[in-house]
Regions:
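Solvent-exposed helix/loop surface patches that form functional interfaces
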Residues: 23-25, 106-199
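Bacterial Sec-dependent N-terminal signal peptides
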Residues: 1-15
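Short, hydrophobic/aromatic-rich segments at coil-to-beta transitions
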Residues: 22-29, 57-64, 89-97, 120-121, ...
Length: 230
């Protein structure tokens, strides 16, 4: 999408982006549901917070997303995920960590971003369930993001003029790999929240490339206003 080309390009200088959507101190909470035989069943909760902090002594945004399955859901499948990221105040990714306990497995994925000489340098780390560690370093030619960083940046995208099917392409990383990913605009819709309020929202699909095809990982909704609250 030409509209967003300045946000995700090969020039590291343009990895910077202006935040227009959130302020330090934002806290959001959610209920988690699972669709079981066409019935939505509450299985846990999630919370997301963003504050201005410091990373290696420099001002940065610190954002975390914590998901927890309920005691009843734990009888079938335990989920304890904690995602953390740091971004510069110009929205450049600096650090990402995902600690995931899913079932009887626990893994840690990390990504460290730096920009020596205006070039992107990426260091990845994974701690596997058996306790072994894997490290990898690379120099991507494009602005590269983690799951939380691209989510924060997307909130400041200007959707004016978007049409259904418009896509934003970008590389995404975790602790082991860098893969092509896409945000696809699905149009506007009205969402009724648990508090009974209805919100006019933009509908977006996050997809990752798998076996040559893009597969939807998650579909999310953000308010159709300047804050784009998820």
């Amino acid at each position: 999408i030409l509209l967003l080309a300045a946000g995700v390009t090969t020039s590291t200088a343009q990895c910077k982006f202006r935040n227009t959507a959130f302020k330090s101190g934002e806290y959001l909470s959610y209920n988690l549901y699972f669709n079981w035989k066409f019935v939505w069943v509450k299985v846990g909760n999630a919370s997301m917070s963003t504050v201005e902090s410091k990373y290696h002594g420099k001002p940065a945004y610190r954002s975390s997303l914590i998901t927890r399955s309920s005691a009843n859901a734990d009888k079938f499948f335990v989920m304890r995920d904690t995602l953390l990221c740091y971004n510069s105040l110009q929205m450049e990714p600096l650090y990402f960590r995902k600690g995931a306990r899913e079932g009887d497995r626990y893994t840690v994925d990390e990504a460290f971003f730096s920009y020596p000489g205006g070039k992107t340098h990426l260091k990845q780390h994974q701690q596997k369930n058996n306790g072994t560690h894997v490290w990898h370093e690379s120099k991507p030619t494009e602005c590269t993001f983690d799951m939380l960083s691209i989510f924060l940046r997307a909130r400041s995208f200007n959707p004016e003029g978007w049409k259904k099917g418009n896509r934003i392409h970008f590389p995404i990383t975790d602790g082991t790999k860098v893969i092509p990913a896409v945000l696809e605009y699905k149009g506007k819709t009205t969402v009724k929240a648990d508090n009974g309020h209805k919100y006019r929202c933009l509908q977006l699909s996050y997809m990752e490339k798998e076996n040559g095809k893009y597969k939807e990982i998650v579909r999310f909704y953000v308010t159709d206003d300047a804050n784009h609250v998820p």
